[in-house]
């Protein structure tokens, strides 16, 4: 069985890139274009990992993270933040750890390596 990963990203080009990269690695990738849709998908089918943007319409990534931490079914789901919001990086690294925050543009090899470490690989 392949490992489910949820990509929550409002930029269609970044979302598509992440979906393509992760699918090519063998992950079962679901996507959401905003935080509200991402929370709904995570609640209905908890993933092994969420890749989360911070700046999104409707419900931003920080709020998504707070909601996940308040939900017993999602509290233990690991999150990797992928953001272009430079000023948010220190706080996110404090919360999630240095290795779980990537600034856009990100190094593909490093991000895929971290996803593999967190999930144990695609299968």
Q: How would you name each of these model-derived features?
A:
Residues 63, 85-103, 109-113:
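Alpha4 helix (beta4-alpha4-beta5 surface) of REC/receiver domains from two-component response regulators
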Residues 80-82:
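Hydrophobic/aromatic residues positioned on beta-strands within the core alpha/beta folds
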Residues 16-24:
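Charged docking surfaces used in two-component/phosphorelay signaling
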Residues 26-33, 41:
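Short hydrophobic/Thr-rich beta-strand motif most characteristic of the beta2 strand and flanking loop
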Residues 15, 57, 75:
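The feature encodes the CheY-like receiver
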């Amino acid at each position: 069985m392949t490992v489910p990963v949820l990509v929550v990203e409002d930029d269609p080009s970044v979302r598509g890139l992440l979906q393509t990269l992760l699918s090519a690695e063998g992950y079962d990738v679901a996507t959401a274009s905003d935080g509200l849709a991402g929370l709904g998908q995570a609640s209905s089918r908890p993933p092994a990992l969420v890749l989360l943007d911070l700046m999104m319409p409707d419900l931003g990534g920080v709020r998504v993270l707070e909601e996940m931490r308040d939900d017993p079914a999602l509290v233990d789901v690991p999150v990797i933040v992928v953001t272009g919001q430079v000023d948010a990086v220190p706080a996110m690294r404090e919360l999630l750890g240095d290795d779980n925050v990537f600034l856009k543009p990100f190094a593909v090899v490093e991000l895929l390596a971290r996803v593999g470490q967190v999930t144990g690989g695609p299968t």
